[in-house]
Amino acid sequence: MKFGPETIIHGDCIEQMNALPEKSVDLIFADPPYNLQLGGDLLRPDNSKVDAVDDHWDQFESFAAYDKFTREWLKAARRVLKDDGAIWVIGSYHNIFRVGVAVQDLGFWILNDIVWRKSNPMPNFKGTRFANAHETLIWASKSQNAKRYTFNYDALKMANDEVQMRSDWTIPLCTGEERIKGADGQKAHPTQKPEALLYRVILSTTKPGDVILDPFFGVGTTGAAAKRLGRKFIGIEREAEYLEHAKARIAKVVPIAPEDLDVMGSKRAEPRVPFGTIVEAGLLSPGDTLYCSKGTHVAKVRPDGSITVGDLSGSIHKIGALVQSAPACNGWTYWHFKTDAGLAPIDVLRAQVRAGMN
């Protein structure tokens, strides 16, 4: 079954997922009910009521009922997920640990838990607990053996000023103009997620054209971010009022032009080029000299692609590590060769070989 760029479905998430083709979606983002178990109104110090989550869809008669619901929707989600796909589930301390058990019991393989640190959290008005300033996201592949899930590591590193992206993300709550309001001026959905959060999830774990399923679509944050980033989406929501807000919101989204969607490619996906190939191609010759960037270590190239420094011999990586007394070394960036413009890393030569493979 081929999906159009936007598919919005009104109905029960379990029933509607069971009606979708098996193994048809690349990514699932789920923001299920939190089962907050509120015993009454939450009040501020001035006795005004906190606009908390007290909607009927968040109410379950027991933990057992919530667990049953969780396993049913996760089973339906797993059926429609491609073997190389992945799932994200977000929750608070009220539900995420119960959801995590179900995720593992049903055969998913947890890759990371992400802490969404809210830079502007709601305070604990009673002063009886720590201010709840984060939520947890579980990112999991379909199974332990699934190794080809999408992870745009280098794109995330570039987005983070060339520093490896960590598992704690500081993103503010959804406020201001981004917050969807009803006709009465009140927020249309109590747990609307910031689009920046979904932008990062989608950018990191999908490719343009992928199909993203959100079984708890709400007011369409996943759909808005997916449309903006050139991904297809399926949104399922049982509350008709939320869907009307979602449709109006998504209609206003202007997609990024397809030619502007390219991100940093993963070096792990590039063809492997042994250093010996550089010698075979004549880009370096046996007897040529390699230098570290500081000029403190000098190596000689041998015909088989190994190098020598004094009595030491081995690969560019092994010798680079030994001369630095380091546990490991990336020889491609450590060793340099002479050019008319000065020293250049031998990784430049590897790039030349790879360019010829395309």
Swiss-Prot record:
- Superkingdom assignment: Bacteria
Mind telling me how this protein is modified after translation?
Answer: Rapidly degraded by Lon protease prior to cell division.
> Which intervals of the chain are annotated as region Methyltransferase?
1-260
A Pfam family the protein falls into: RAMA
Q: Where does dsDNA bind?
A: H94, Q164, R179, K267, R272, R350
* DNA-binding region per Swiss-Prot/TrEMBL record: 31-34, 39-45, 93-94, 109-110, 122-132, 153-157, 187-193, 315-317, 330-332
Transmembrane intervals? none
Catalytic activity of the protein: a 2'-deoxyadenosine in DNA + S-adenosyl-L-methionine = an N(6)-methyl-2'-deoxyadenosine in DNA + S-adenosyl-L-homocysteine + H(+)
User: What are the start and end residues of every segment in region (Non-specific DNA-binding)?
Assistant: 272-358
What are the recorded GO MF terms, alphabetically?
DNA binding; N-methyltransferase activity; site-specific DNA-methyltransferase (adenine-specific) activity
Q: What class of enzyme is it?
A: transferase
One GO term of the biological process aspect: methylation
All residue ranges annotated as the RAMA domain in the record: 259-355
EC identifiers of the protein = 2.1.1.72
Q: Which PANTHER family match?
A: RNA METHYLASE-RELATED, TRNA (GUANINE(10)-N2)-METHYLTRANSFERASE HOMOLOG
What role is this protein assigned? Opens a bubble in the DNA at the recognition site, allowing precise recognition of the sequence and ensuring enzyme specificity. Functions only in the predivisional cell. Responsible for 5'-GANTC-3' methylation in the cell; methylation of hemimethylated sites generated after replication fork passage occurs late in the predivisional cell, near completion of chromosome replication but prior to cell division.
Q: Which family does it belong to?
A: Belongs to the N(4)/N(6)-methyltransferase family.
Domain remarks: Has an N-terminal methyltransferase (MTase) domain linked to a C-terminal DNA-binding domain by a 10 residue linker. The MTase of one monomer recognizes, binds and modifies the target strand while C-terminal domain of the other monomer binds the non-target strand.
How it assembles, according to the record, is: Homodimer.
Protein's recorded name: DNA methyltransferase CcrM
Species annotation: Caulobacter vibrioides (strain ATCC 19089 / CIP 103742 / CB 15)
